[in-house]
Amino acid sequence: MEISWGRAMWRNFLGQSPDWYKLALLVFLIVNPFIFLANPFVAGWLLVAEFIFTLAMALKCYPLLPGGLLAIEAVIIGMTSAAHVREEVAANLEVLLLLMFMVAGIYFMKQLLLFIFTRLLLSIRSKMVLSLAFCVAAAFLSAFLDALTVVAVVISVAVGFYGIYHRVASSRGEENDMLDDSHIDPHYKTVLEQFRGFLRSLMMHAGVGTALGGVMTMVGEPQNLIIAKAAGWHFGDFFLRMSPVTVPVLVCGLLTCMLVEKMRWFGYGETLPEKVRDVLQQFDDQSRKKRTRQDKIKLIVQAVIGVWLVTALALHLAEVGLIGLSVIILATALTGVTDEHAIGKAFTESLPFTALLTVFFSIVAVIIDQHLFAPIIQFVLQASEHAQLTLFYLFNGLLSSISDNVFVGTIYINEAKAAMENGAISLKQFELLAVAINTGTNLPSVATPNGQAAFLFLLTSALAPLIRLSYGRMVWMALPYTIVLTLIGLLCVEFTLAPATEWMTQAGWLATLS
């Protein structure tokens, strides 16, 4: 018997999302206009809370859909205007270009990145050294590339290796279902569980590595570029200004990586079983024999393009998004990717998040029009200049651990810049606050998958169920990093940021706008 029209509409609305989630969103959409009529300020804060809720529930439904509905309603009922949304989007065009073109550009360098991580995995026998190598490699790559892409590459390596061993363990060949363990021989099951633990720890080290490297440069994370643009910094300026906080945090993060592996704390410490290593090494040897001269030239070309990418970013030869576009053109032209559909696949990863970021800017427009953060900013600005840095760092960190750090960073840098333009703070203080905001949004956000897009990508990937990586387990494994990164970042913001910045300015390394 066919279902009713009403039931059919209900099932279509937000698709497979739970009924309670659909109902919650409908309640939001119904009550918002009435609350806005009664008290626009309260309605604005309610909208922000609802939007953060959709980000926190990203596993139930991709936030673009519910967040987009809330944003559309906000424009319709007058919380902001379509013209203001357009202005916010136009002001952040560089960030949108970064997401569209840089992420797509790195897609065409995946073969090189896969080659690097595969060599690391099979060449290094010490688990501690291997974990450190994965963390450092992810940090370095994320400083110049998109963190999502770096994590995607590591996921590809892990899924590939897991599938190779699972086929051997189940004796099912090409018909093997990686999610089905029913055909695994009993003596292989223990080895498989150890292999899962090994992959889980490597994925978490790599994920944290992207956060450690991503905070250091203006292209490491989308919000970095927003903050850099607001402060008028180029690539070198940004790196130097962040370094009093980010360099000590990087060192302590790497020490944490070694410590948890050595002590086998928080689910770390599993080694690669020898049986698995033998199978993977055999497969890699066969793959290397099959590699043609054409394949080798592709790897060389991608490496050269990587050098161009780093050089162009460091010397600021063009806007970041345009450098990404040049990578797309060079990588496709020189490696023989000429089919439109093959090129189109590169954009599937970035465009949903680009659309979501545009929705972020709609909510930011509401925050500006309704002056939602005015009381918080006034409270912070009443404190001493030294205390302001700590408060901005903590407020950013708290929000970023439960919400998306791009959203949080955008809000706070806009408010800080408005305070500077109104004469509430000096330019020098604004530049220090920009560092506190950037580090505050990036470092504590490793606490949960909600804050770091790369972590959320890992949690929702095909790999997560294979290696038994759940939301709770991810939070638990991230906990030592969360504590160390947050505390060291806070101490550096409080004690080393201002004097180190002053020293670099006097040494002529930094130029302050006047």
Swiss-Prot record:
InterPro entries in the record: Na+/H+_antiporter_NhaB
Membrane spanning stretches: 23-43, 63-83, 97-117, 120-140, 144-164, 202-222, 238-258, 303-323, 357-377, 391-411, 447-467, 475-495
Membrane topology: Multi-pass membrane protein
UniProt subcellular location: Cell inner membrane
GO molecular function: sodium:proton antiporter activity
GO cellular component, as recorded: plasma membrane
Keyword Transport tagged: yes
Pfam families to which the protein is assigned, alphabetical: NhaB
Entry superkingdom: Bacteria
Keywords of the record: Antiport, Cell inner membrane, Cell membrane, Ion transport, Membrane, Sodium, Sodium transport, Transmembrane, Transmembrane helix, Transport
Primary localisation category: membrane
Listed name of the protein: Na(+)/H(+) antiporter NhaB
Organism per entry: Salmonella agona (strain SL483)
Gene (name only): nhaB
